[in-house]
């Protein structure tokens, strides 16, 4: 009976022995922990640099071109005189007055560009 008990104890001892590669920190891969966080940051930095280049190479010239086109359109619009206003029955209908000011002006009224019924244009266009 003693011979049967010995092999069982040896196998139990072998199964309970911890296979260790060294100290506590070495077995938990602390060195690789930092690298696992730094590697995606390096990749993100490369992607952000790519998008910065795309912005400076594509977006800024497009913005400049759009600003130039808007400036030219504004100059063309301001170069000719304002046409005579034609009063149509369906324009500037006032069934009841607006609840602000004198009731005859819209909320975002532009004196130089919007016609007021009964008054006309309140100001001339500025030349600039």
Swiss-Prot record:
The keyword Transmembrane applies. GO terms for molecular function: enzyme regulator activity; oxidoreductase activity. Residues 1-19 form a transit peptide. Keywords: Membrane, Mitochondrion, Mitochondrion inner membrane, Oxidoreductase, Transit peptide, Transmembrane, Transmembrane helix. One of its GO terms (cellular component) is mitochondrion. It comes from the Eukaryota. The chain crosses the membrane at residues 54-71. Pfam families: COX6A (PF02046). Coiled coil: none annotated. Gene3D superfamilies: Cytochrome c oxidase, subunit VIa. Residues 72-128 are mitochondrial intermembrane. GO terms for biological process: mitochondrial electron transport, cytochrome c to oxygen. It is a single-pass membrane protein. It is found in: Mitochondrion inner membrane. Pathway: Energy metabolism; oxidative phosphorylation. Its main location: mitochondrion. InterPro entries: Cyt_c_oxidase_su6a, Cyt_c_oxidase_su6a_CS, Cyt_c_oxidase_su6a_sf. Component of the cytochrome c oxidase, the last enzyme in the mitochondrial electron transport chain which drives oxidative phosphorylation. The respiratory chain contains 3 multisubunit complexes succinate dehydrogenase (complex II, CII), ubiquinol-cytochrome c oxidoreductase (cytochrome b-c1 complex, complex III, CIII) and cytochrome c oxidase (complex IV, CIV), that cooperate to transfer electrons derived from NADH and succinate to molecular oxygen, creating an electrochemical gradient over the inner membrane that drives transmembrane transport and the ATP synthase. Component of the cytochrome c oxidase (complex IV, CIV), a multisubunit enzyme composed of a catalytic core of 3 subunits and several supernumerary subunits. The complex exists as a monomer or a dimer and forms supercomplexes (SCs) in the inner mitochondrial membrane with ubiquinol-cytochrome c oxidoreductase (cytochrome b-c1 complex, complex III, CIII). Belongs to the cytochrome c oxidase subunit 6A family. This is Cytochrome c oxidase subunit 6A, mitochondrial. It comes from Caenorhabditis elegans.
